[in-house]
Amino acid sequence: MRATTAFQVIAFLAVGAAAAPTGLVQARAVDSLAVETDDIASSAGPRADDNGAASAGLKVKRQREYWCPNQVCAKTFATQEERDHHIANTVHPTNSKRDVLLQ
């Protein structure tokens, strides 16, 4: 078992060394505000304003669900207002035996 594990580790390291990049891009200083247009490191990768479909001009509708805090009810709502209305106007069953004992 140990020989197999050692062999696997050696093989993993050999493959990892072969796949490692040969040239590294020099990192800029953290407080550097200048961005050079011919610098590969500054022009590659995602930007802060890059949002996939949104940057392509498509409208992205964000969906968020709101849940009733009562675990027995567990209904979902599209808006916070619907959830608040449900909580204010619904008699909920108790969440647990502990809640029944405290009443």
UniProtKB/Swiss-Prot annotation:
GO cellular component, one term: extracellular region
Zinc finger region(s), C2H2-type: 66-92
Subcellular location as annotated: Secreted; Host nucleus
UniProt signal peptide: 1-19
Keywords: Host nucleus, Metal-binding, Secreted, Signal, Transcription, Transcription regulation, Virulence, Zinc, Zinc-finger
GO MF annotation list: zinc ion binding
Superkingdom assignment: Eukaryota
This protein's record includes keyword Zinc-finger: yes
InterPro entries, alphabetized: Znf_C2H2_type
Region (Disordered): 82-103
Entry keyword annotation includes Transcription regulation: yes
Induction: Expressed during multiple stages of host plant infection, including the prepenetration, early biotrophy, late biotrophy, transition and necrotrophy.
Function, as annotated: Probable secreted effector that translocates into the nuclei of host cells to reprogram the expression of targeted genes by binding on effector binding elements in rice.
Protein name: Host transcription reprogramming factor 6
Organism for this UniProt entry: Pyricularia oryzae (strain 70-15 / ATCC MYA-4617 / FGSC 8958)
Lineage: Eukaryota, Fungi, Dikarya, Ascomycota, Pezizomycotina
